[in-house]
């Protein structure tokens, strides 16, 4: 019987890897894309929809769930899996990114970060110990440590000071929940901005702490694609090879392909569902905007190469009509398709790595998104 936290690599192709991470709520095959369920639900879709399209793990947001409905209320309901009826694994972030995005509404100290709720202005304090407590109440399969995500453009002195504090916070998180304490896994988050030596320092310090996996944080925060790829390809291979590697909040299909190429195992992003609500849909021929007049009488499927419910059942003309009529069904059908696209991408990557053909697989996506590919290795 597999042990919770066990990460087994099944194949590699260059730096790309495929394997399985065992969690309390089942296995997660990597590389994997995690749909984002900020407040406990993935926008526009139900758990049955997610199950039908092959989602294996979703993400919840500690900050938002703490403020509403409250982590203690969720705990009284039996945890987030019971509360939202998603029986497979859940990863919760620490809420740090959201808190630091509040800018003028927060204050950072060694103790933690004090902030005011965006809902009612009430004052709160997130300490490393507090965010662990919240996530244990949520009973997520994977908990993330509290970290400071420094803003893009922060100077090296500030980034270095922030990094040292983030490392101390990471140790406090682990002290609050030692390895092997229960069924919840805990990942550390490497930081360091866009300074390679600080990134290396962060990895060196964090890997001395016994985390179950490691994340690259602080990317996709306003930098250019070239800058992001430079840090990604430099740092990803430095993360422990025997632990899962997670690229937080990134990104486009080509970002994910490049992340896999650099040795990353796990991804999350709001892009597929956010773009679905805006009418931007991903297809095997690239992105299309379903709002456009050219689709008004198009009886063909959204993507003839996709087998999702949306593509099997409805025409582009109908999807365009739903969007312009502002029907809620539009959000659901578009989200089902976009999420299927992202999940098919990582499913195909797993197969290509196992077959030793990932370079060829990557080249297909480079051809679909040539302008973006020109900015990537």
From Swiss-Prot:
Single biological process term from Gene Ontology: queuosine biosynthetic process
Family annotation (InterPro entries): ArchSynthase1/Queuine_TRR, TGT, TGT-like_sf, tRNA_ribo_trans-like
Binding site for substrate: 93-97, 147, 191, 218
Residues forming the catalytic site: 93 (proton acceptor), 268 (nucleophile)
Region (RNA binding): 249-255, 273-277
Associated pathway: tRNA modification; tRNA-queuosine biosynthesis
Key words, A-Z: Glycosyltransferase, Metal-binding, Queuosine biosynthesis, Transferase, tRNA processing, Zinc
Gene3D superfamilies reported for this sequence: Queuine tRNA-ribosyltransferase-like
An annotated GO cellular component: cytosol
EC numbers for this chain: 2.4.2.29
GO molecular function: metal ion binding; tRNA-guanosine(34) queuine transglycosylase activity
Cofactor(s) required for function per UniProt: Zn(2+)
Cofactor note: Binds 1 zinc ion per subunit.
Pfam families linked to this entry: TGT
Residues reported to bind Zn(2+): 306, 308, 311, 337
Catalysed reaction, written as an equation: 7-aminomethyl-7-carbaguanine + guanosine(34) in tRNA = 7-aminomethyl-7-carbaguanosine(34) in tRNA + guanine
PANTHER family: QUEUINE TRNA-RIBOSYLTRANSFERASE
Family according to the record: Belongs to the queuine tRNA-ribosyltransferase family.
Function: Catalyzes the base-exchange of a guanine (G) residue with the queuine precursor 7-aminomethyl-7-deazaguanine (PreQ1) at position 34 (anticodon wobble position) in tRNAs with GU(N) anticodons (tRNA-Asp, -Asn, -His and -Tyr). Catalysis occurs through a double-displacement mechanism. The nucleophile active site attacks the C1' of nucleotide 34 to detach the guanine base from the RNA, forming a covalent enzyme-RNA intermediate. The proton acceptor active site deprotonates the incoming PreQ1, allowing a nucleophilic attack on the C1' of the ribose to form the product.
Subunit structure: Homodimer. Within each dimer, one monomer is responsible for RNA recognition and catalysis, while the other monomer binds to the replacement base PreQ1.
Protein name as catalogued: Queuine tRNA-ribosyltransferase
The organism of origin for this protein: Oleidesulfovibrio alaskensis (strain ATCC BAA-1058 / DSM 17464 / G20) (Desulfovibrio alaskensis)
Gene name per UniProt: tgt
């Amino acid at each position: 019987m597999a042990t919770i936290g066990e990460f087994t690599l099944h194949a590699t192709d260059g730096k790309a890897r495929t394997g399985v991470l065992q969690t309390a709520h089942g296995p997660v095959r990597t590389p994997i894309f995690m749909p984002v369920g900020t407040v406990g639900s993935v926008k526009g879709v139900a758990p049955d929809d997610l199950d039908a399209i092959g989602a294996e793990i979703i993400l919840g947001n500690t900050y938002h769930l703490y403020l509403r409905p409250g982590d203690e209320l969720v705990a009284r309901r039996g945890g987030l899996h019971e509360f939202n009826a998603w029986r497979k694994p859940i990863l919760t972030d620490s809420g740090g990114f959201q808190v630091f995005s509040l800018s003028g509404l927060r204050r950072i100290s060694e103790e933690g970060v004090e902030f005011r709720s965006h809902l009612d202005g009430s004052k709160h304090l997130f300490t490393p110990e507090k965010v662990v407590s919240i996530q244990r109440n949520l009973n997520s399969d994977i908990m993330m440590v509290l970290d400071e995500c420094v803003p893009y453009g922060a100077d090296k002195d500030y980034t270095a000071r922030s990094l040292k504090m983030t490392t101390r916070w990471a140790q406090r998180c682990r002290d609050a929940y030692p390895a092997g304490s229960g069924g919840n896994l805990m990942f550390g988050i490497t930081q360091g901005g866009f300074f390679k030596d600080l990134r290396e320092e962060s990895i060196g310090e964090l890997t001395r702490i016994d985390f179950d996996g490691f994340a690259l944080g602080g990317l996709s925060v306003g930098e250019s694609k070239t800058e992001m790829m430079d840090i990604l390809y430099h740092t990803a291979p430095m993360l422990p090879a025997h632990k899962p590697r997670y690229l937080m909040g990134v990104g486009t299909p080509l970002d994910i392909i490049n992340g896999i190429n650099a040795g990353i195992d796990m991804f999350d992003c709001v892009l597929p569902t956010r773009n679905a609500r805006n009418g931007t849909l991903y297809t095997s021929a690239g992105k299309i905007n379903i709002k456009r007049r050219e689709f008004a009488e198009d009886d063909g499927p959204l993507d003839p190469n996709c087998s999702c419910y949306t593509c099997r059942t409805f025409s582009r003309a109908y999807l365009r009509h739903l969007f312009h009529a502002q029907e809620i069904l539009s959000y659901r059908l578009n989200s089902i398709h976009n999420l299927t696209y992202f999940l098919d991408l990582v499913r195909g990557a797993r197969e290509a790595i196992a077959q030793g053909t990932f370079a060829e697989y990557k080249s297909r996506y480079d051809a679909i998104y040539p302008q973006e590919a020109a900015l990537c290795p």
